[in-house]
């Protein structure tokens, strides 16, 4: 057997959404911060992402995380979040998966009943508290980066749909949030392709007409997620379908999307601090969110969210790159 590269991985899923945690084979990515490492990775190493996320090693909804040494003294590990759509500043379900893998594999000192793990991410420091019972990770609560509303009742002209009203919020990534009935579609997986097509059209229109940019980091820009809320959703329990570029649905309730949703509801005066919020995915799995603090991002009112969810280890693997492989960077259909 011949191979140009060997990548070591622990696979997991968080409430139905995969996280392939890369524990070796990448090396230390250049950069003095995880944000700089992300920029270097995107510019010089994106073939590693596509090799590991795209077919034939991955699939059209694959997600993962690359472990790195931290760039700051208060963190245990650095994390770079990868998926078919790109390299994210932050990923909530991925963080829950990473924290579970670190505990289940003994890559951190395990303390019962709670093991605290501090992760250095491109979006900032993220703290994960892992509930441990008999040595097993049973749930993870993450304290996410400050999240904020970037605009309520915004409008965008979408080809094939017309004028669409949406709220824009940030929870580690930017999210357009709107009721699914506002685009004339039912909340029904039988209509998933129509829902996905509408989501992609909306995010393309937003990015063409009014691309969002994080006020503290110009490298965090663009809307690549559209959260369609189901009829009957409110500030205590919300169901949604999360359409994601370049064309797939989140299987989990989406951690950064849950953070953005809570920031939106707080901005509307509907979700106070210290109140549980249940966010349910398109397949019926759930995260429990809570806003624990008000803060600011530049001059924007912001909130600090926590998200609680579960993940399970599904296997370990080594991924190779045979020098004769006709798809050295993978492919997508």
Swiss-Prot record:
Name the catalytic site residues: 91 (proton acceptor), 254 (proton donor)
GO molecular function of the protein, one example?
4-hydroxyproline epimerase activity
Which purpose does this protein serve, as stated in its record?
A: Catalyzes the epimerization of trans-4-hydroxy-L-proline (t4LHyp) to cis-4-hydroxy-D-proline (c4DHyp). Is likely involved in a degradation pathway that converts t4LHyp to alpha-ketoglutarate. Displays no proline racemase activity.
Q: Which organism is it from?
A: Streptosporangium roseum (strain ATCC 12428 / DSM 43021 / JCM 3005 / KCTC 9067 / NCIMB 10171 / NRRL 2505 / NI 9100)
> Where do the annotations place substrate binding?
92-93, 225, 250, 255-256
Catalytic activities: trans-4-hydroxy-L-proline = cis-4-hydroxy-D-proline
Q: Which domain of life is it from?
A: Bacteria
Q: Which cysteines are joined by disulfide bonds?
A: none
**Family membership:** Belongs to the proline racemase family.
Record-given protein name: 4-hydroxyproline 2-epimerase
Q: Does the keyword Secreted apply?
A: no
What is the E.C. number?
5.1.1.8
The record, for InterPro entries, names: Pro_racemase_fam (IPR008794)
Q: Do the record's keywords include Isomerase?
A: yes
Q: Which UniProt keywords apply?
A: Isomerase
């Amino acid at each position: 057997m011949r191979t140009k590269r060997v990548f070591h991985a622990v696979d997991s899923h968080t409430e139905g959404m995969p996280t392939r945690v890369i524990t070796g084979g990448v090396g230390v990515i250049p950069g003095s911060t995880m944000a700089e490492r992300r920029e270097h990775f995107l510019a010089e190493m994106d073939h590693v992402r596509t090799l590991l996320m795209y077919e034939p090693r991955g699939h059209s909804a694959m997600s993962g995380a690359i472990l790195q040494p931290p760039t700051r003294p208060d963190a245990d590990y650095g994390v770079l979040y990868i998926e078919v759509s790109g390299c994210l500043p932050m990923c909530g379900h991925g963080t829950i998966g990473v924290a579970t893998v670190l505990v289940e594999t003994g890559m951190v000192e395990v303390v019962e009943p709670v093991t605290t793990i501090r992760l250095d991410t491109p979006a900032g420091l993220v703290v994960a508290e892992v509930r441990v019972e008999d040595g097993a990770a049973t749930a993870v609560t993450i304290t996410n980066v400050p999240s904020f509303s970037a605009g309520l009742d915004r409008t965008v002209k979408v080809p094939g749909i017309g004028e669409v009203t949406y709220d824009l919020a940030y929870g580690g990534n930017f999210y357009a949030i709107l009721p699914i009935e506002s685009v004339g579609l039912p909340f029904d997986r039988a209509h998933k392709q129509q829902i996905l097509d509408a989501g992609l059209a909306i995010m393309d229109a937003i990015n063409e007409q009014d691309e969002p940019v994080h006020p503290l980091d110009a490298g965090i820009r663009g809307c690549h997620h559209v959260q369609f809320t189901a009829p009957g959703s409110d500030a205590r329990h919300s169901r949604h379908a999360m359409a994601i570029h370049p064309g797939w649905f989140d299987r989990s309730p989406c951690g950064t999307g849950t953070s953005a949703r809570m920031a939106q509801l707080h901005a509307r005066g509907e979700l106070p601090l210290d109140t549980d919020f249940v966010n349910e995915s398109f397949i019926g799995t759930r995260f429990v969110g809570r806003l624990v603090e008000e803060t600011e991002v530049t001059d924007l009112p912001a909130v600090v969210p926590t998200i609680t969810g579960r993940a399970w280890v599904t296997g370990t693997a080594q991924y190779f790159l045979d020098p004769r492989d006709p798809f050295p960077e993978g492919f997508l259909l």
